[in-house]
């Protein structure tokens, strides 16, 4: 049986696909987008979610869409919750019978 991989936090994407390749420090990003450095650090370490406010700022800074960042966060949140619920969801919720 294949082992399920852990969901990828948006902070990992921010670090590995944006900050590291562009040689941008977390501190510089925070200053450039006018947010506390702690916010970026917590996102980068998977301790904080990307809010709509942060998504708007990141999208403007990196030339992406705000949906890109929000979709990363939403997908992560769903995967974490799916893992947490496990088979309980099937036991607790039945599909609505139609027609």
Which role does the model predict for each range below?
Residues 70-99:
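Short, charged recognition helix plus adjacent turn
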